[in-house]
């Protein structure tokens, strides 16, 4: 360690703050917080016999140290979190911002509230229920609610503009407040019952429903009594599946972890109103810091990304700086008292042990899956002669409609799994007509330039196409100056002498093109390596087609609006401001349009838009997805680059 760094260590303050460890290139490799900065940072250099890789290499890795002083531990937690999100250091716990927590939102301030599926909690006065462990679990809950409690499911826009009841009203699952004057008192009674059901307050809810059922039977309202009976049966079946975990009926998040070497898996067990509500695992690698630091950092990041903050947070061990700062921060986020506890006995300790058992089981399962994936990736590296182990792969596809709406997609796979935080969409900027080779050159150039700026390059690029597309991608790599990334092309065979295209069962084998190799490589079509590549290629194709249709629709509606006589810039802005998007303008009825531009102009706009039919026919190519629950990501495009030799 150089003398300048030793001086910094000697001069470290004893106050609370955040420290940033940097490598010799100035890159932040770790961010931590401490009540006493000097004690915490110097402890990394005073631990004799410490076998952790990070500590043993700290003298070689550390190039600089930066500290930021704050007033208290709560401020240190906030600043630590912001700096981790900003720098994404390699040795910190990093949570993906992928909206993975599904919950239900109910805004009781509305005249006719509805349940909404959301992925983030806001302090907006609404009630939130969850999180749910899977989309299937939340669908089952909504199925029961929609069938037996009869709340509306339509959006506020539809509620305000619908002129006649929908099918749900006709089958008795919605009172249709969009059309009929439904008494708010009756509707809000159903809302109260939904809240009791979602909170797990079975006794109070069931007792009230039984009284209503008896009253309906006494008044000879047998259909209503039968409906309430079915409602009771469904509620009781649903509650039977939920295990009672505690007798104090609180909302709790229970944290635990399992660690082997530098790999760690955190597990969060959700308890709502004393009942187990599921849980989720969070695996991480290259984690060399003490357990106490990692659990504190993980909990802080977990709640920062919008997770519901319960009444109690249970931890598996004491934190180095205590729980006071974390408790104050969570209390501020929730707006009411939150207790952070490390249980020593009783039901709470049993919950921590249960979470730890789930963490160990999830760790073992993921280790087995990772070992299998690593074997497949190793074989792929060997068969294709790749320089890099293909831990992170990105696949690119070009899509257009008859030469217009030219777009490209980028999908990413990390350790064999879809990495949707790295999905990107591109609009081709430098071409006015179709040229797949030049389009591929542009997209690869833009991707690699951005990757060089952010020090974020994949191990392998997979190009959807044959020799031509591969040559364009390789030319872009050379022009940008990237030589460390492998690149291959993936295309179907067109050898008609070998494969009968008319035979129903015939399937052309996939061929893999490699730079500098004359003949393509043909892997076994049923191999795991081939399946991984084709699944990624099909996902890139699906993603590109979806984006291309969005672009095409927007351009057509925009063009149609511009061609309608009397619709100038002001009216176009009025329509977009009212409906929110070009798609909604195109979907609007004449009556809905008339509310914005008047009856006469509404008929003209409706006729003009529907005179430009959209290409909604199903694509003949079967589109496969890496994840059925995929949601489109926001468009992220980087700076353009002129096409080169393609």
UniProtKB/Swiss-Prot annotation:
GO terms for molecular function: DNA binding; excinuclease ABC activity. Residues 604-637 have a biased composition (Basic and acidic residues). Residues 14-93 form the GIY-YIG domain. One of its GO terms (cellular component) is cytoplasm. One of its GO terms (biological process) is SOS response. Residues 203-238 form the UVR domain. InterPro entries: DisA/LigA_HHH (IPR041663), GIY-YIG_endonuc (IPR000305), GIY-YIG_endonuc_sf (IPR035901), GIY-YIG_UvrC_Cho (IPR047296), RuvA_2-like (IPR010994), UVR_dom (IPR001943), UVR_dom_sf (IPR036876), UvrABC_protein_C (IPR050066). Its main location: cytoplasm. Pfam families: GIY-YIG, HHH_2, UVR, UvrC_RNaseH, UvrC_RNaseH_dom. It is found in: Cytoplasm. Keywords: Cytoplasm, DNA damage, DNA excision, DNA repair, Excision nuclease, SOS response. HAMAP family: UvrC (MF_00203). This is UvrABC system protein C. The gene is uvrC.
